[in-house]
Design a protein with these regions (language model features):
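Phosphate/pyrophosphate-binding active-site segments
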Residues: 1-5, 154, 304-408, 520, ...
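N-terminal alpha/beta PP-like core and its mobile active-site loop of ThDP/TPP-dependent enzymes
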Residues: 2-345, 349, 397, 469, ...
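Active-site diphosphate/adenylate-binding microenvironment
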Residues: 11-22, 32-42, 362-448
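Charged, low-complexity, helix-prone segments enriched in Lys/Glu/Asp/Gln
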Residues: 70, 112, 353-379, 442-443, ...
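Thiamine diphosphate
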Residues: 116-131, 279, 322, 329-331, ...
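A glycine-rich phosphate-binding loop feature that marks nucleotide/adenosyl-phosphate handling sites
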Residues: 178-183, 409-411, 564-566
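Conserved short loop/turn motifs at secondary-structure junctions
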Residues: 230-235, 378-379, 456-458
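Serine-centered coil/turn micro-motif
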Residues: 266-267, 402, 486
Length: 568
């Protein structure tokens, strides 16, 4: 069935269609290209039409990260709009993050007015000449699944429905739609559209049965099977399927470079966060949604190990170079493929063998977790604060209704995440500044949950904190921000030491890595009405965390803890 609504412009029809297609938020960093859209919003507000809710985000980095954070929690794409090509340039790092993380997103930007006169949206500012580009889509084309320019009111429904369908199809990712001001500003009286989009969205697929059986034979025949995963938990439904598979095999599951809760940490078969100790023995390795299961330059699977890869795109076809071998590659939705594999393995491994393996993994896990806790508690008096102790203190206050967004510094070995969808780490694409906006998006997606954002001081600066704290206050999205302040870009420092272990930089100092003297980050949060504390005494850290969580939950106000950590 179709629906017919009275409108005044293409912009109004566009907002009507986004709302009808389930877009709840438009995260926006506005410019002169927004004029028709803002006028359309004003009319919709006056007539009681609130969706998609516009969120003003005063910097493109948190704007894109907010859409990313909302989608990673809910699985539902949201819309972002930035100011023509200059806004898209500022947003590109976030788009790369979304692309590599497989996050659906309708990314849009205004299109500089094409005409110099004669139309309602024609050029009337100096920037409208200087901002014109020959091919605006070229800026981000490599990192979006599809890009297009809306050229005519009559194609609005087709274009938007196709954009959303392409974004949601696996492997998911952002799409880019440019919106010329003249087209948005065109006057129209009526917009008619289908109640339900008919753009094809492919159903989730499962790998071919014969390929699943071959993979099952490889795993069942192994004496030391191993599972490595990075992002199986992107689909929470894949987690119980992975648990069933691991239990059928009695195989350890390693969260290598993990970005999600992929496997409950309290399960006896959780194998920790480093696959290296297992690779020498493993004669079959199941790699699940992992672009980089190990570093070939440092440690690889045995040459004779049989390798099975499971992912929506097991070849990671958008990566120019990726040379990880596979005997069987199983494309499709991991929850379906893993469930099929678990069913094929049922009874294939004797129960006594699986139980013996399970006990061996469990014993190693108990020892590993005990050692991690002992290490953290032994460092609990150190000042400046050790990150292991900070991570342990955070782990002690977590519950299933708390979501953690981690941009690098939280040590997961000091925590115990068991519920899918409660932990998200920065994409390995490394577009810094992701954490602040992603945490805000997560809070909008799950308003009944507590959201904690763990972020390094360098990443905090990249995240446009003035903008992020303002958004938190303006839209009542309280987050507990924890800055792991070690006053250095440690990833850069580690890279230098890896490149030249005994070189000049180690002996004489490292330019381009220092963040000393540190700003008083707590003042940035306070400027937007938040509570903030600098924490220097490790013995006062648990009380500071308890105080912070009470304020976030009871007062619904953001809190920042600037934790002074050891400088490496």
């Amino acid at each position: 069935m179709s629906k017919k609504v009275a409108i005044e412009s293409t912009a109004e029809a566009y907002l009507e269609l986004l709302a009808a297609r389930g877009i709840e938020y438009l995260f926006a960093n506005a410019g002169t290209d927004f004029a028709p859209l803002i006028e359309a919003y004003a009319k919709r507000f006056a007539t009681g039409q609130a969706l998609p809710r516009p969120i003003t985000v005063p910097h493109e980095v948190p704007a894109v990260a907010m859409a990313h954070g909302f989608a990673m929690v809910t699985g539902r794409p949201q819309a972002v709009m930035v100011h023509v090509i200059v806004g898209a340039a500022n947003a590109t790092g976030g788009l790369i993050n979304a692309a590599r993380a497989g996050v659906p997103m309708l990314f849009t930007a205004g299109r500089n007015p094409i005409t110099e006169a004669g139309f309602r949206g024609s050029r009337n500012r100096p920037i409208h000449w200087a901002q014109e580009s020959f091919d605006q889509g070229a800026l981000v084309r490599e990192f979006v699944k599809w890009d297009y320019e809306l050229r005519n009111f009559s194609q609005l429904e087709t274009v938007v429905d196709r954009a959303l369908a392409v974004s949601a199809a696996e492997p998911q990712g952002p799409v880019y739609l440019t919106l010329p001001r003249e087209v948005l500003g065109e006057a129209h009286d009526v917009f008619e559209y289908a109640d339900t989009p008919r753009a094809p969205r492919p159903a989730d697929a499962v790998a071919a049965p014969e390929a699943v059986q071959e993979a099952a034979r490889i795993l069942a025949a192994a004496r030391r099977p191993l599972v490595i995963t990075k992002a199986a938990g992107r689909d929470p439904g894949a987690v119980p399927a992975l648990v069933a598979l691991a239990e059928a095999l009695g195989a350890p599951v390693v969260d290598q470079f993990h970005t999600h809760v992929n496997f409950p940490q309290d399960n006896a078969l959780h194998g920790g966060f480093d696959a290296s100790p297992y690779l020498d023995e493993a004669d079959a390795v199941l790699v699940v949604e992992s672009d980089v299961p190990w570093f070939p330059a440092l440690k690889s699977a045995r040459p004779d190990a049989r390798l099975v890869h499971v992912a929506v795109d097991p070849l990671f076809t958008r990566y120019p170079v990726r040379g990880f071998a596979a005997d069987v590659a199983l494309p499709g939705a991991p929850r379906l493929t893993l469930a099929a594999l678990a069913a094929a393995l049922r009874g294939a491994v004797p129960a006594s063998v699986a139980a013996e393996r399970r006990e061996r993994v469990a014993a190693a896990g108990r020892e590993r977790r005990s050692a991690a806790e002992a290490r953290a508690r032994a460092l609990g008096q150190d000042q400046p604060i050790d990150m292991a102790w900070l991570s342990r203190c955070i782990g002690d206050v977590l519950d299933p209704r708390t979501i953690v967004v981690n941009e690098y510094d939280l040590d997961a070995s000091q925590t115990c995440f068991t519920t899918p969808g409660t932990y998200f780490a920065a994409p390995s694409s490394g577009g810094l500044g992701w954490g602040l906006g992603a945490a805000l998006g997560a809070k909008l997606a799950a308003p009944g949950h507590t959201v904690i954002c763990c972020v390094g001081d360098g990443a905090y600066i990249f995240g446009a904190p003035t903008a992020a704290h303002w958004v938190s206050r303006a839209y009542e999205a309280p987050v507990l921000w924890i800055v792991f302040n070690n006053r250095v870009w440690n990833a850069v420092k580690r890279s230098v030491l890896s490149h030249a272990p005994d070189g000049w930089a180690k002996r004489t100092g490292m330019p381009l890595t220092e963040l000393d003297p540190p700003p008083d980050y707590e003042l940035i949060c306070q400027a937007s009405g938040g509570h903030a504390e600098k924490v220097e005494d490790p013995t006062k850290l648990p009380a500071a965390l308890a105080r912070a969580l009470d304020i976030v939950r009871r007062e619904r106000r953001q809190v920042l803890l600037n934790v002074m950590c050891k400088k490496p």
